[in-house]
């Protein structure tokens, strides 16, 4: 993974956020979804659906960190609320994509993506697979440790996020093409794809890993990949990820932001 900022961080105030954005604490008691980004130039005017703001907008500057006290709060959120929030976002993605695919192809049930060229884009880390336990067990909890994460990736010790697997499998059953777009490096490609396949998420039409030589931000690279897919004739509906950089600058129809209170990738 290419992490520009990875820190102890919980959104506690809208002071740090773009004033056009809706911000709530991710420790909310309900798991409702709503439009967390609206008419933002960073999203190409596309809506992003989530259960909260997560971390600062890409327009924020500098290192955003709240200090080293929130470990207990992060664990509390993970143990009591995260699963419900993940389920809500995934359910929203399934419901929206079902309606979008039917209207796009003008058919009520099963689709044939070879005719309609419908596609969904998925991030990997903390979207399809969870790195929470890796971060928790880091020498300094929730501070990124590249060696530990690489070992977990190589051994497939990153558990599946079940609601996203459900969405992935639903899209496949409807004939929607699935593409993997991840900041993981190319030398992690084989381990990652083998792990995803073992978790029941396979038959993707393409998998894109960030090249070592690419020096721009994750948001710029992922946008370029989506644009290449569009240029190849794919109609991208949902873009699903845990970072706004998974759905920045457009080239998708609707974004779905999985909850992540641990780190921020620009």
What are these regions (language model features)?
Residues 129-130, 135-160:
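Metal-dependent phosphoesterase signature
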Residues 2-7, 11-14, 19-122:
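Non-catalytic pre-domain segments flanking phosphatase-related domains
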